[in-house]
């Protein structure tokens, strides 16, 4: 082949090479293949161990050449007090690690917290978090207890009772803890209609000013029993 045909073939070959080169360039991220010289932690974490985060990042891949950032991100998010991590490469050689801490919404047991997703994290000193509602039960039941807390809090607020905690025993019996120190025993059935009995009885219960309520037992089908502070030590109570 000579003349115009040869020139056309050569032109087509050159065009193909240019297209292939452009495609490779578009799919090639040079930053992923450059060594990282520095690490910057952002997000102003207050509780997460930034030294441990730095150590984990540095140990992940020597020189950080070709580091799989997704794998590293998952490892960092599994660390205590880390809810989410974003990794960004900053020109020319910086890896930015943006840390978002979990938002605690409740205490759990003796030394853990529950975040807004229902996940447990800790151990922590709960004295710093005593303003949060206290939940207790078997691990894995925290979402159920969170929902129960919201339900009973809303129902008892109608009578001026403040719920500060909910406990589920090993036999799935429920106890509600009030801000004044009183306990409300629910048994295995958290029936909001039974809570209505307490709401309706609240004015009469508050009319007695000589002793605070220690315990309210709602495990009766059609009534409740009240133990006052001086009677609680003897496990007594007045049925209504």
UniProtKB/Swiss-Prot annotation:
Subcellular location as annotated: Cell inner membrane
Disulphides: none
Periplasmic side of membrane: 29-240
Transmembrane segments: 8-28
GO biological process, alphabetically ordered: cell septum assembly; FtsZ-dependent cytokinesis
Cytoplasmic compartment residues: 1-7
Membrane recorded as keyword: yes
GO CC terms of this entry: cell division site; plasma membrane
InterPro entries cross-referenced by the UniProt entry: Cell_div_FtsQ/DivIB_C, FtsQ, FtsQ_C_sf, POTRA, POTRA_FtsQ_type
Stored Pfam families: FtsQ_DivIB_C, POTRA_1
PROSITE patterns for the chain: POTRA
Membrane protein topology class: Single-pass type II membrane protein
Keyword terms, alphabetized: Cell cycle, Cell division, Cell inner membrane, Cell membrane, Membrane, Transmembrane, Transmembrane helix
Domain POTRA, first and last residues per copy: 34-102
Claim: Transmembrane is one of the keywords in the record: yes
PANTHER family linked to this entry: CELL DIVISION PROTEIN FTSQ (PTHR35851:SF1)
Protein's job: Essential cell division protein. May link together the upstream cell division proteins, which are predominantly cytoplasmic, with the downstream cell division proteins, which are predominantly periplasmic. May control correct divisome assembly.
Subunit-level organization: Part of a complex composed of FtsB, FtsL and FtsQ.
Homology family: Belongs to the FtsQ/DivIB family. FtsQ subfamily.
Protein name: Cell division protein FtsQ
Gene this protein is translated from: ftsQ
């Amino acid at each position: 082949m000579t003349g115009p045909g040869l020139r056309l073939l050569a032109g087509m070959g050159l065009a193909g090479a240019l297209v292939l080169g452009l495609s490779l360039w578009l799919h090639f991220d040079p930053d992923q293949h450059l060594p990282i010289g520095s690490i910057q932690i952002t997000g102003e974490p207050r509780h997460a161990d930034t030294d441990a985060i730095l150590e984990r990042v540095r140990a992940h891949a020597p020189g950080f050449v070709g580091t799989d950032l997704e794998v590293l991100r998952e490892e960092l998010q599994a660390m205590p007090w880390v809810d989410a991590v974003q990794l960004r490469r900053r020109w020319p050689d910086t890896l930015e690690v943006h840390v978002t801490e979990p938002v605690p919404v409740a205490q759990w047991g003796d030394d853990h917290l529950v975040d807004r997703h229902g996940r447990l994290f800790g151990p922590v000193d709960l004295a710093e978090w005593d303003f949060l509602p206290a939940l207790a039960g078997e691990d894995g039941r925290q979402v159920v207890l969170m929902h129960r807390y919201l339900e009973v809090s809303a129902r008892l607020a109608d009578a001026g009772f403040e719920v500060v905690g909910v406990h589920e025993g090993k036999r799935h019996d429920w106890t509600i803890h009030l801000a004044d120190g009183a306990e409300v025993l629910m048994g295995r059935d958290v029936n909001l209609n039974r809570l209505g009995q307490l709401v309706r009885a609240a004015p009469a219960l508050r009319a007695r000013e000589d002793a605070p309520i220690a315990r309210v037992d709602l495990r009766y089908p059609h009534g409740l029993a009240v133990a006052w502070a001086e009677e609680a030590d003897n496990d007594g109570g007045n049925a209504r």
